[in-house]
Amino acid sequence: MTLLSLFKNTNNNNPHTLIWGGDDFLNDYLANSYIKEDQFKDLEHVSVDCENDGLDELIASLTESSLFSENKLILIKNPFFLTAKVPKKLKKQMDDLQKIFDNLNELEDVVVIVASYDKLDRRKKLTKTVLKQFNVVEPTIRSYEVGVVVKSLIKAEGYTITQSALQLLIERSDQVIDTILSNYQKLKMAASDNKITEKSVMQNVDLSLAQNIFAILEAALNKNYQ
């Protein structure tokens, strides 16, 4: 099981993938897991940040051959070209990207886009093309789904966690998925035989801010009544 399979995929047989949602930490976590899959281990991995590197660098990565292997895996971050915030001076680059994504099936490389935006400009032709040509994954997690998703994610990565440990992890993370994943990283490093126990959570995950405040208030109240 892959982590992306925990969420709705529009075409999970298509390696070209768009991970789209407002949670950048979760998106990056899923993307990093995906590109490390065995099917991509022989590809040269290239990462392009559109905001820092620019669209010319992206186009070059998409059109130039790899120097180190037959094919590449191109990870695209901050793809502002899918939003409404594209300067008019970049029209040529937008046209070039349109041609590339129109003919994505001819591209021997694998393209993974991480779009950490709440909204994309669906009116734009380029956005429509990407949504059509890519396997689109929207990793949204409702509050009541946190426990099930986290447990499934942990299982997919080859770890086990007791129900009491899972509940404690969620509580100490204030039920925030980014914090849960961050704390889970600590637990993986400390896990013996890939097993996460309640004792491990207590030893490696601090009380949440809310729990600390509650403990301070409780201690103060107890002191007043003594």
Regions of interest found by a model, annotated:
Residues 2-8, 14, 25-222:
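Non-catalytic interfacial helical region
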Residues 19:
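Hydrophobic anchor at the beta1->P-loop junction of P-loop NTPases
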Residues 22:
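P-loop (Walker A) phosphate-binding loop of NTP-binding proteins
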